[in-house]
């Protein structure tokens, strides 16, 4: 299906579909219902959620009395501007999209291909390496979720009967797949194998990819990553005959597979797989058809959240805030693309949209007095705190209050577990973290790295996102897990930290131009008296080290969370790497950005049949 871009005078992005597939139903009426709010039951749980440092400050931070002197009368009441551009995505166009892959005939064909593929996967006589390569292809093509039982059966059999491989490539592939699927495997499997295969480019590539599944203390994998990267870069600098291997090497050095957003990787690998000499036509047809069917499901989710967003009228009434509904939806595909989780994507898109809006209230709109009152309203969940606030800030409060009561009501109906207090606590923590950053801004205070990091992993909003995610994927909701959830288990903390650091690498320059509070790069520069490039290198190292911690948290068999929740936490970190790899992929709304290209490829451009 070919698509052509046309830019309208108001910078809306439109895609011209073939006339036969384009249907334009009248868009639904957008009625602002924001003041028709429900007042939820007050939380019965009251407890300190943030650390003492996050609430009261570190020893070098200005005292609360210092902040109390900052009043509206002391400030220039001219509101700041984030200088955000308008949304590129047209509401009527989104509602008009018709995707043929919703038709039953495509699902029937997919089911037939799946049955044929299962027979191929479980065929007798295949060698161990052939089975591992097939699993790898299934995974990178984005269709392994259809064959979870078969894959686990094969890997379990290999685990029980496997003999040491004499190939660096086979050993590295086995290591990566075992770790990805939760099987214990030691770094000792490589022994001295790696040092003797410097001419094996494919083996070095797969060892390089495997090294990113290391946990803390696995020094041999760290060494392997360093020397394989050196050899792979030298390989690209020299002329080579195998263009497929060169393309894989370039792709890996740009961003390792373990850090990549799954759906973008699937789209890229489908195009790569077409060119392989050993390509399996059945598997290629399955991957393309599955991609297009899943894309059709995502479009229906996007239509739903676009209607919701228009009905809130937040974009019209808060023009200072980023109107990034499609980008907010894109995040949810990265966290959980599976077609059966449409409710997850719809709710998490609302979370993302509200986070973005409230973040901009704190960053570019509110005065110190207003933000204090705004935060108190969220701490007490009491509308009386809103009396002296501008109407658009009241709208934010009502929109969020409506939303979390809706989510809590749905969860209680399904699980008979009251979750309102957990949702409220997570949002309160976020607003308190935003307020602390606002205090730093208004007092022109540059926090230490420790002060900044203590607050920033919460202000990046990952805890809010993942608290909601648990209630959206857990079935049943386990009351014993809620303690780990509300205290932000390491799985949440490390995912949040990667999101924060990746965000800082991609956005700090632009945010400083707007006058925002310093980010980790500037805090480190100020504290250590180093250059910006040295600070950026330090942040990249922190990201790498945090991935090791997240890998460890993922691998610990004793963690209390369902596998799907852990995958969501891992995928949120991957999505951060994707969104901020080439700058601010969330806030800019740039037509030519990588984010726009990714959104086009995942949502609006079907893959033609092979």
From Swiss-Prot:
Organism field: Nicotiana suaveolens
Family: Belongs to the terpene synthase family. Tpsb subfamily.
Motif position, DDXXD motif: 359-363
Chief location bin: plastid
Activity at various pH: Optimum pH is 8.
Biological process according to GO: alpha-pinene biosynthetic process; circadian rhythm; diterpenoid biosynthetic process; green leaf volatile biosynthetic process; limonene biosynthetic process; monoterpene biosynthetic process
Lineage: Eukaryota, Viridiplantae, Streptophyta, Embryophyta, Tracheophyta
Cofactor section: Mg(2+); Mn(2+)
Cofactor note: Binds 3 Mg(2+) or Mn(2+) ions per subunit.
The UniProt record lists the keyword Mitochondrion: no
Induction, per UniProt: In petals, transcripts, protein and enzyme activity levels follow a circadian oscillation, with an increase during afternoon to reach a maxima in darkness and exhibit lower levels in the morning, thus leading to a nocturnal emission of floral monoterpenes.
A molecular function GO annotation: sabinene synthase activity
Transit peptide residue numbers: 1-51
Pfam families, sorted: Terpene_synth, Terpene_synth_C
Matching InterPro entries: Isoprenoid_synthase_dom_sf, Terpene_cyclase-like_1_C, Terpene_cyclase_plant_C1, Terpene_synth_N, Terpene_synth_N_sf, Terpene_synthase-like, Terpene_synthase_metal-bd, Terpenoid_cyclase/PrenylTrfase
Residues bound to (2E)-geranyl diphosphate: 322, 359, 363, 500, 503
Gene Ontology CC terms, in alphabetical order: chloroplast
Tissues where this protein is expressed: Confined to buds and flowers.
Annotated positions binding Mg(2+) 1: 359, 363
Described purpose of this protein according to its UniProt entry: Monoterpene synthase involved in the biosynthesis of monoterpene natural products of the 'cineole cassette', volatile compounds present in floral scent. Catalyzes the conversion of (2E)-geranyl diphosphate (GPP) into 1,8-cineole and, as minor products, limonene, sabinene, (E)-beta-ocimene, beta-myrcene, alpha-pinene and alpha-terpineol.
Gene: CIN
Protein name in the entry: 1,8-cineol synthase, chloroplastic
Binding of Mg(2+) 2, residues: 359, 363
Primary enzyme class: lyase
EC numbers: 4.2.3.108, 4.2.3.106, 4.2.3.-, 4.2.3.111
Keywords: Chloroplast, Lyase, Magnesium, Metal-binding, Plastid, Transit peptide
Recorded domain comment: The Asp-Asp-Xaa-Xaa-Asp/Glu (DDXXD/E) motif is important for the catalytic activity, presumably through binding to Mg(2+).
